[in-house]
Amino acid sequence: MKLITILFLCSRLLPSLTQESSQEIDCNDQDVFKAVDAALTKYNSENKSGNQFVLYRITEVARMDNPDTFYSLKYQIKEGDCPFQSNKTWQDCDYKDSAQAATGQCTATVAKRGNMKFSVAIQTCLITPAEGPVVTAQYECLGCVHPISTKSPDLEPVLRYAIQYFNNNTSHSHLFDLKEVKRAQKQVVSGWNYEVNYSIAQTNCSKEEFSFLTPDCKSLSSGDTGECTDKAHVDVKLRISSFSQKCDLYPGEDFLPPMVCVGCPKPIPVDSPDLEEALNHSIAKLNAEHDGTFYFKIDTVKKATVQVVGGLKYSIVFIARETTCSKGSNEELTKSCEINIHGQILHCDANVYVVPWEEKVYPTVNCQPLGQTSLMKRPPGFSPFRSVQVMKTEGSTTVSLPHSAMSPVQDEERDSGKEQGPTHGHGWDHGKQIKLHGLGLGHKHKHDQGHGHHRSHGLGHGHQKQHGLGHGHKHGHGHGKHKNKGKNNGKHYDWRTPYLASSYEDSTTSSAQTQEKTEETTLSSLAQPGVAITFPDFQDSDLIATVMPNTLPPHTESDDDWIPDIQTEPNSLAFKLISDFPETTSPKCPSRPWKPVNGVNPTVEMKESHDFDLVDALL
């Protein structure tokens, strides 16, 4: 148990330990604003005419620790009302009128030196004037070291030179190739200084056979690896004038050159033209040996190998299917023979030995029939994921629904002997069909008075087992429990106990005594006695109409007695599970606008709203 706990905690900590050095942070961070302030101040100081630009908002930011802290920024600016010659800073300026103001977007890399000093390494701004084409302004700090992308095209000549330098100045038996560039920095001097950190991997090309890397040289997964840190200076003529390299090699697994196996089977593509002759001989052999009346045809080739053994030996696995061409009317199998979708299917293993110089072919084929699956017929519209229980009763077949949380097991009724009491009940129904549990149907009289045999509660007459849904004799004497919220001359019981013991036990039953014509009711779709419901005539509507009661019974406390009470603490694991996905957080970028534009609140975006019109909803 302790080991499982440790592994679980480690799996949660590993993602945090393997995070990259570059990470996104909040655009409203104080240090981010200071970095943007340094970048925008630097841009304004480079311009000698026109107005200063004012920050609108920061759109993207990422921090890199390598080992100094660098901020990669993207922010939007708007032209202000302060001239460049004024002694004001951009923070003291307001936005110029939008119709006449220029806008722009800048991308910058800013280094943080110490705790408070920010210096701009590189910056590019795209300015869109109120009238005229877009103007691009670039700035690169002379002498400032700043990180660059590991996929920068400027690194390609440096890396190419570095790999060649390593292969020429090491005593390793094989050539190495670039594996991954991990980190790169650039500095503008009288030329450019580069510092690159990358990994290398051993290839399959030995120095005895190859003097330099070629496209045939591939990195070995089990070969030696290394990690290098290089420093290079590229002059203004784009030549590498100085270079230094430091590499650490790590031995891999024992490298063994692949052995060439003469005579071993080699896999070949299943659609290779070399298989055509072998397949033709295989299917001809199959049709000659099979005693069926129809020809077989190759449907699918699963796999194939070829082996050089005094010739060529083909081993083929394929699926053959019976065609519509009979052997009696066709001398041989032709391409026009179509596959019989209801015919026999064979799984075949063929070995074809071809001796080209003798022009002889020796095929052998072994086939096994594949089993055929027959589908069972279901009632129309009936899903295989639904189950219906069919119960035999006297003279009829009843379809019952699966039990739900509101229906007890049917055996409760049969096992309950308390419902055999000698209590007589009288029911009164003044020409109305009241939708209560246990309303029975019988001979309709003016006042509908009578007695009946009951095993459920309610006003019903006849032999009934549930809700009084059935036809029977209106006049009769029987024993059973009665419940009537109106007039009841029988004994009064608590309504909870008989309801739970008898409600929802059987789906529907039909009396086997009398079939008399009754008034038209909503229950005319009930199953008639002596008529069995067969599956071809069975419909979903029949199932629903037969078993759904008119009204649902009231919910009781005892209905949920089968659900156990689980005691949990509010702060327990049952309430606070560890999610497999990161929690969603509010977006960190873009930042809030620096100040309002034309009187608009910078923290609230105003949207035009219209009153709701009913016509819009109807369109």
Swiss-Prot record:
This is Kininogen-2. Its main location: secreted. Bradykinin is released from kininogen by plasma kallikrein. CDD domains: CY. InterPro entries: Cystatin_dom, Cystatin_sf, Kininogen, Kininogen-type_cystatin_dom, Kininogen_Fetuin_HRG, Prot_inh_cystat_CS. The modification Pyrrolidone carboxylic acid is found at Q19. The record marks M376, K377, R386, S387, R496, T497 as: Cleavage. Residues 1-18 form the signal peptide. Keywords: Blood coagulation, Disulfide bond, Glycoprotein, Hemostasis, Hydroxylation, Inflammatory response, Protease inhibitor, Pyrrolidone carboxylic acid, Repeat, Secreted, Signal, Thiol protease inhibitor, Vasoactive, Vasodilator. Plasma. It is found in: Secreted, Extracellular space. Residues 394-495 are annotated as: Disordered. Residues 27-131, 150-253, 270-373 form the Cystatin kininogen-type domain. Disulfide bonds join C27-C589, C82-C93, C106-C125, C141-C144, C205-C217, C228-C247, C261-C264, C325-C337, C348-C367. The keyword DNA damage does not apply. The modification 4-hydroxyproline is found at P380. GO terms for biological process: blood coagulation; inflammatory response; negative regulation of blood coagulation; negative regulation of cell adhesion; vasodilation. It comes from Bos taurus (Bovine). Glycans are attached at residues 87, 136, 168-169, 197, 204, 280, 396-398, 400, 404, 510, 518, 522, 534, 546, 551, 568. GO terms for molecular function: cysteine-type endopeptidase inhibitor activity. (1) Kininogens are inhibitors of thiol proteases; (2) HMW-kininogen plays an important role in blood coagulation by helping to position optimally prekallikrein and factor XI next to factor XII; (3) HMW-kininogen inhibits the thrombin- and plasmin-induced aggregation of thrombocytes; (4) the active peptide bradykinin that is released from HMW-kininogen shows a variety of physiological effects: (4A) influence in smooth muscle contraction, (4B) induction of hypotension, (4C) natriuresis and diuresis, (4D) decrease in blood glucose level, (4E) it is a mediator of inflammation and causes (4E1) increase in vascular permeability, (4E2) stimulation of nociceptors (4E3) release of other mediators of inflammation (e.g. It comes from the Eukaryota. GO terms for cellular component: extracellular region. Residues 442-490 have a biased composition (Basic residues). The record marks N47 as: Not glycosylated.
